[in-house]
């Protein structure tokens, strides 16, 4: 477990609620131990406290089982281009077509390709996943290989702008990530950080608890973005909120190098995550009440990073038959529902054609529905998306 707050260094912590009892759903190399949503009582940072390390997450993101997604395939061309234009507008007046730009944890390279197409020819990305680098290379995107937490001494230049677009919240060692970025940034350069907006979690039109995905280790509000800058010597030049690609609310902060300053306590993030927990439970209630009443046999499909919280009592009074996930590294994991142990199984292990399949995830909903159809299941299918 974490021994101190990574922002302010405070050693005490407030445990808010358990996310999951078994971190091994992230992979065999993760510890068989719980993860707890936690608040720093000194600065108000909200983080997931667990026994995992940055190396565990590095292995997770470089695993052969990882599925790099492209913005265009998820959101479509129109929504993606509008979203990328929204991002570009946040710092367009700070750069030129000759500026050196690095997209931190750039994934499959979609944003860098967008920048190149719009005239920013000196754009490249930092990425740890060889699979992502291969995909980006086919798009003509240049990559710097690295995990984002180490100082890269081989770089021949520094950057005018570094972007972290939905990457910072995925790192345990955000202190090392920020210091590495500052080292790669010119003294008069800018750092753009964009993360999910915790204050708007309850507005998210998706499966309840989706924003508590285990891949998101830290949760942020505009106030905690101020503290992030204060702790690591970054001055906030601009910050704000907007809606990402017709999907969910995000916030951003544009920083430049400065001196470290004192953090201030804010309850905004704690209030937001607790409100989202209550909102999610209330949204689920009619759905779960019906299952409890009918006692129809249920096959729960999609036991992963964004759905494990649903295993914490949600289905305890329902007639659960099986837990299913197609990810091999999750098969064999054990969960207890109403004091009965269940093992996550392969879709091929489904034998009861009358049981109702309940699709749990938001992120992989469409691919699961497609797989159910392709495998020829005749079961009734319901989704937590409604």
Regions found by a protein language model. Give the residues of each.
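Short loop/edge segments at beta-strand edges and connector loops
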Residues: 145-147, 238-240, 344-346
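Conserved S-adenosyl-L-methionine
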Residues: 14-20, 234-245
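Conserved SAM-binding loop
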Residues: 85-207, 211-232, 255, 309, ...
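Hydrophobic, well-ordered beta-alpha structural blocks that scaffold small-molecule cofactor pockets
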Residues: 250-386
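Short aromatic-enriched loop/helix-cap "lid" or pocket-rim segments at secondary-structure transitions
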Residues: 18-20, 202-207, 250-252, 334-336
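Class I S-adenosyl-L-methionine
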Residues: 217, 226-231, 246, 259-270
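Conserved N-terminal segment of class I S-adenosyl-L-methionine
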Residues: 1-165, 175-178, 250-254, 258-294, ...
């Amino acid at each position: 477990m974490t021994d101190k707050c990574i922002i302010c260094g405070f050693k005490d912590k407030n445990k808010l609620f358990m996310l999951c009892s078994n971190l091994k759903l992230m992979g065999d190399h993760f510890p068989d131990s719980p993860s707890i949503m936690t608040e720093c009582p000194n600065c108000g940072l909200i983080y997931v406290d667990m026994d995992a390390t940055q190396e565990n997450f590095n292995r997770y993101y470089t695993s052969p089982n990882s599925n790099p997604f492209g913005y265009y395939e998820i959101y479509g061309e129109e929504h993606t281009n509008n979203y990328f234009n929204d991002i570009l507008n946040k710092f367009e007046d700070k750069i030129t077509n000759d500026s050196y730009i690095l997209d931190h944890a750039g994934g499959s390279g979609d944003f860098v390709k967008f920048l190149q197409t719009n005239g920013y020819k000196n754009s490249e990305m930092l990425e740890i996943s060889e699979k992502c680098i291969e995909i980006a290379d086919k798009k003509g995107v240049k990559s710097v290989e690295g995990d984002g937490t180490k100082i890269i001494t081989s770089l021949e230049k520094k950057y005018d702008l570094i972007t972290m677009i939905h990457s910072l919240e995925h790192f345990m060692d955000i202190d090392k990530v920020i210091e590495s970025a500052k080292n790669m940034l010119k003294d008069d350069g800018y750092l753009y950080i964009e993360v999910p907006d915790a204050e708007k979690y309850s507005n998210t039109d998706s499966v309840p608890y989706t924003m508590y995905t285990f891949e998101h280790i830290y949760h942020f509000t505009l106030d905690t973005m101020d503290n992030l800058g204060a702790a690591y010597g970054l001055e906030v030049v601009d910050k704000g909120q907007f809606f990402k690609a017709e999907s969910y609310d995000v916030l951003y902060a544009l920083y430049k190098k400065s001196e470290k300053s004192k953090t201030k306590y804010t309850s905004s993030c704690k209030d937001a995550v607790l409100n989202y927990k209550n909102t999610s439970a209330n949204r689920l209630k009619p759905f779960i009440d019906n299952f409890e009443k009918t006692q129809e046999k249920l096959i729960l499909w999609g036991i992963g990073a964004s759905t494990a919280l649903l295993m914490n009592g949600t289905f305890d009074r329902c007639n659960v038959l099986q837990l299913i996930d197609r990810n091999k590294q999750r098969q064999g994991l054990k969960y207890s529902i109403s004091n009965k142990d269940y093992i996550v199984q392969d879709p091929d292990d489904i034998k009861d054609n009358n049981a109702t399949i309940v699709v749990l995830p938001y992120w992989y909903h469409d691919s699961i529905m497609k797989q159910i159809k392709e495998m020829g299941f005749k079961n009734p299918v319901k989704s937590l998306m409604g």
